[in-house]
Design a protein with these regions (language model features):
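Class I SAM-dependent methyltransferase Rossmann-like catalytic core
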Residues: 33-77
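Class I S-adenosyl-L-methionine-dependent methyltransferase module
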Residues: 98-231
């Protein structure tokens, strides 16, 4: 079953049990349940989702449909703000950023996204180097927070907020290869540690173990972007 958010992007529905009733289970089932609880990761029916988005031109078609909206945008000082939740693998967002650059090549961009899937975050980061070459004055933010928390970049869970992982990546160099190497290094060193998922004990839905925010921008643009770079709260 496919559902659509306000931008029309397809999302595979995430099915998970909310409650396991007390009953006799085979030893094999008990082992499986214990393994799932200990080694839970967010896949969101990932095989079907990836098969769909990689074998169709859906995201390109949606980006084309959004062009009239982009052309009507009027940014307000100090930047054009773009919010994408959830980001997915970033394919659609990158197309939108290209369109915005064509219309506003000299306006600073503050792009804020949320994505709970570590795999999608990795794929999204891999697409970023070219964006920082074409549009230098960009601040890109990724969080694993809930939808209602993602604009404030702050967890509503007081206990979890104390464990906030706030990572700032200042890209150095002047080529997409330089930026790509730095982001790949960040992926290897930090991403798997700070993007862990668990089940919400009340709803059974996937949620973050620890709130995490990644802020990315070019080091040589820090002075001009100072007013729009988010600060840890």
């Amino acid at each position: 079953m496919w559902t659509y958010d306000v931008t029309g992007r397809s999302r595979s529905s995430f099915k998970c049990f909310k409650k396991i009733y007390k009953k006799k289970l085979s030893s094999r089932k008990l082992k499986i349940l214990k393994f799932m609880k200990k080694n839970f990761r967010f896949f969101d029916n990932r095989q079907k989702y990836l098969l769909f988005v990689t074998t169709t031109n859906e995201k390109n078609m949606i980006a084309d449909a959004l062009k009239p909206i982009v052309h009507k945008l009027t940014p307000k000082f100090p930047s054009l703000k773009i919010f994408d939740a959830g980001m997915g693998d970033g394919s659609l967002l990158m197309n939108i950023m290209r369109q915005c650059h064509q219309k506003m090549p000299h306006i600073p961009f503050l792009v804020s996204t949320k994505e709970i899937s570590m795999e999608d975050v990795r794929l999204g980061l891999e697409k970023l180097p070219d964006r920082f070459i074409e549009h230098k004055n960009t601040v890109f933010v990724i969080s694993n927070l809930n939808y209602t928390e993602s604009t404030s970049l702050k967890s509503n869970n007081f206990t979890k907020q104390k464990k906030m992982n706030w990572k700032v990546v200042k890209l150095r160099g002047n080529s997409s290869l330089d930026f790509s190497n730095q982001l790949r290094k960040f992926n290897r060193k930090f991403l798997s540690k700070i993007w862990q998922i668990e089940r919400n004990p009340k709803t059974g839905n996937p949620t973050y173990k620890e709130p995490s925010v990644i802020v990315i921008y070019r080091k040589d643009q820090e002075f001009t972007l100072k007013n729009i770079i988010p600060k840890k709260k």
